């Protein structure tokens, strides 16, 4: 069977075939009915595949070869910071003192692990310019919600119950308005100006006594630095609102600028992005939230504190918004982030930003003659092109993304941000070499030429992948979410 026809694991099943043998029972046997109510006990055996260990290994090894990750190729997914994750991180995370402990252990038995969390919080405070950090949130959007809940608690503690609106720019990540809604706020959108930055006059019109916060990414999702950030902070603060920093793009300013110095009050970070936790497969992530002093009472509890040289969790936090996650955050990702920060140091983190920005600008300038550049100015860590020129030739941005698969690349982010027509969002990160960037650029140039000379090549792509184009509408409206085999053996 070739890679094109890889069977489902269920189709490989043969009755009586065994992949693993359990040891003999060495404890008293107990009837399942004595442990579980009848409603929870199966009436028939689960339809699990019966396959050998060798079959399993070959099956999943074959499937893994269809996957694409940072370790296998360039991954320029804009706004996702798909940088290489140093394998040193994995070695440290596997140390028994970190990997073989349990969150319910007595605090005295895990002081080393707690010291790592305490030190990591301190490093993140220094990097962001915040006064205290919680490591509880599990990922970026979770961090957003946590930060907004603290902002809500802050306003309500002051009796300011009328602050029910959160302002977001039209270039914002989709999680920003979603998090605001889940936190109980109404979202107000402000537009971008002709330079791709927040329109200051529109912001002034939007801010009023109902404003709870302005959520902002800096640099923004166009890869452009909001150069008027201090003026924006003053506008919002004078109206009694607060500034929330979406840390998705922190890779662009490490050791160069700090959100706290820009005027932000609450910050969330994506340790799985900026600080090299492996991501892209659905988790786990880590989305710590940093706050200025006035928000410390509202931090999720428990809060890790040091008393007389001993680390302990403080649960006596009457104004806390409460727990936002079981236990104390995704510890394994925090270990990896700590390892990265300590191994890089301040100068190394500064070099990260410098090289990320250099790579992005190099790519942008080389591609500008072949694709529209909606905002022709220096970018930070990422940039946005437009496929408007190709669209006039009958080639959509989606077609360009599909064609890149034939060259062995994961496509960039497409159709985001929403305020750029046929947008193509590229983030090379600092870890890619010039040779890799040039090879990707050459592929993009070839696709642009194909759109002019042989558009059907791009329109019908991909040509080399196991799965070609799917019916995306049907996949969205009538997804097949479970395996069922009919009596004749067909799917």
Curated annotation (Swiss-Prot):
Its cofactor is pyridoxal 5'-phosphate. The modification N6-(pyridoxal phosphate)lysine is found at residue 273. One of its GO terms (biological process) is glycine decarboxylation via glycine cleavage system. It comes from Bacillus velezensis (strain DSM 23117 / BGSC 10A6 / LMG 26770 / FZB42). It catalyses: N(6)-[(R)-lipoyl]-L-lysyl-[glycine-cleavage complex H protein] + glycine + H(+) = N(6)-[(R)-S(8)-aminomethyldihydrolipoyl]-L-lysyl-[glycine-cleavage complex H protein] + CO2. Keywords: Oxidoreductase, Pyridoxal phosphate. InterPro entries: GcvPB (IPR023012), GDC-P_C (IPR049316), GDC-P_N (IPR049315), GDC_P (IPR020581), PyrdxlP-dep_Trfase (IPR015424), PyrdxlP-dep_Trfase_major (IPR015421), PyrdxlP-dep_Trfase_small (IPR015422). This is Probable glycine dehydrogenase (decarboxylating) subunit 2. Belongs to the GcvP family. C-terminal subunit subfamily. Its EC number is 1.4.4.2. Signal peptide: none annotated. The gene is gcvPB. One of its GO terms (cellular component) is glycine cleavage complex. Coiled coil: none annotated.
């Amino acid at each position: 069977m070739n890679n094109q026809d890889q069977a489902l694991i269920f189709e490989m099943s043969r009755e009586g075939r065994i992949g693993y043998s359990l040891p003999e029972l060495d404890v008293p046997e107990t009837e399942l009915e004595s442990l579980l109510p009848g409603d929870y006990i199966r009436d028939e055996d689960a339809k699990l595949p019966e396959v050998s260990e060798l079959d399993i290994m070959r099956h999943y090894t074959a499937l893994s070869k269809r996957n694409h990750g940072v370790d296998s190729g360039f991954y320029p997914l804009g706004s996702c910071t798909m940088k290489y994750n140093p394998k040193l991180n994995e070695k440290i995370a596997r140390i028994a003192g970190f990997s073989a402990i349990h969150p319910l252990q007595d605090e005295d038995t895990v002081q080393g692990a707690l010291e790592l969390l305490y030190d990591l919080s301190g490093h993140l405070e220094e990097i962001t310019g915040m006064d205290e950090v919680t490591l509880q949130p599990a990922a970026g959007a979770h961090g957003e919600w946590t930060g907004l809940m603290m902002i809500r608690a802050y306003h309500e503690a002051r009796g300011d119950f009328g602050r029910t609106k959160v302002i977001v720019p039209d270039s914002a990540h989709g999680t920003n308005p979603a998090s605001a809604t889940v936190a109980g706020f109404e979202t107000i959108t402000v537009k971008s100006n002709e330079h791709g930055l927040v329109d200051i006059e529109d912001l002034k019109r939007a801010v009023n006594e109902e404003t709870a916060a302005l959520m902002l990414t800096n640099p923004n999702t166009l890869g452009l630095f909001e150069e008027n950030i201090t003026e924006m902070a003053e506008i919002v603060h004078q109206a009694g609102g607060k500034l929330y920093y979406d840390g998705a793009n922190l890779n662009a300013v490490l050791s160069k600028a700090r959100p706290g110095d820009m005027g932000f009050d609450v910050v969330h970070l994506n340790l799985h992005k900026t600080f090299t936790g492996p991501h892209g497969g659905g988790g786990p992530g880590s989305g710590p939230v940093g706050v200025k002093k006035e928000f410390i009472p509202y931090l999720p509890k428990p809060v890790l504190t040091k008393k007389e040289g001993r680390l302990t969790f403080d649960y006596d936090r009457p104004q806390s918004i409460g727990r936002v996650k079981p236990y104390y955050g995704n510890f394994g990702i925090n270990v990896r982030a700590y390892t990265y920060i300590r191994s890089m140091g301040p100068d190394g983190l500064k070099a990260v930003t410098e090289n990320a920005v250099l790579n992005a600008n190099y790519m942008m300038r080389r591609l500008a003659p072949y694709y529209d550049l909606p905002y022709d100015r220096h970018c930070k860590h990422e940039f946005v092109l437009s496929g408007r020129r190709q669209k006039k030739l009958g080639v959509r941005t989606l077609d360009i993304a599909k064609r890149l698969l034939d060259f062995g690349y994961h496509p960039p982010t497409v159709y985001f941000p929403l305020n750029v027509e046929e947008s193509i969002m590229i983030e090379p990160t600092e870890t890619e070499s010039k040779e890799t960037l040039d090879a990707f650029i050459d592929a993009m140039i070839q696709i642009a030429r194909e759109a002019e000379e042989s558009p059907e090549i791009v329109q019908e792509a991909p040509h080399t992948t196991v799965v070609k184009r799917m019916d995306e509408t049907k996949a969205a409206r009538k997804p097949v979410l479970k395996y069922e085999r009919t009596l004749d053996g067909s799917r």
